Amino acid sequence: MKTLLISASLVAAAVLPSAAQAQAIPAAVIAVVDLDKVTSTCNSCKTAAAALRSQAQGLQTRQQALATPLQTEQKAIQAAIDALKGKEPDAALRSRVQAFQAKEQQAAQELQAQQTQVQRNQQYIQKQISDKLGPIYTQVMQRRGANMMVEIGQTLASGQTLDVTNDVVAALNTALPSISTTAPAQARPATQGR
């Protein structure tokens, strides 16, 4: 009986360390990627960034085009009000003020809509890029033998051999040859029937 217990304890002692060893976490093999470089040097990213800059410049140009005549009209109305020296404005001047306020509100709404569209376009571009990057990270990690990838801006220091940015850029150029720079139209809320 004593021999049986000793044999069983020896078998258990031999089996338990191998079970614990199977639970061990593998050593980290880390790769780093510079996402700023990826998104600024991939071919379609450069094209999309130029299109966004053009949209933003168009918005700024439109803002100036709307502001100039409004400012001129506002000065003329203010001069007419000042000329009254505190008297009540006549119906024509009140009508002119109301028309000016309507134009001003319409211009603000137009600019807000364009600004919203530019922001939606930017988010849509970023989504297209990030949708492609997820699988690319996995592919590059497997190809380079890494089991962890970190953005280079989150590291204190790293060796050049850990940098896989060029691999990610090359894969992104292949996976995303072009980017749509106009977000699809937003779904309209359904109107309730009668």
What is the role of each PLM region?
Residues A13-Q21:
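C-terminal segment of classical bacterial N-terminal signal peptides
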Residues Q21-R194:
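Amphipathic, charged alpha-helical segments and their helix-to-coil junctions
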Residues M1, L10-A12, A108:
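Domain-scale selection of a single, long terminal region
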Residues M1-A8, S18:
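Bacterial N-terminal signal peptides that target proteins for export
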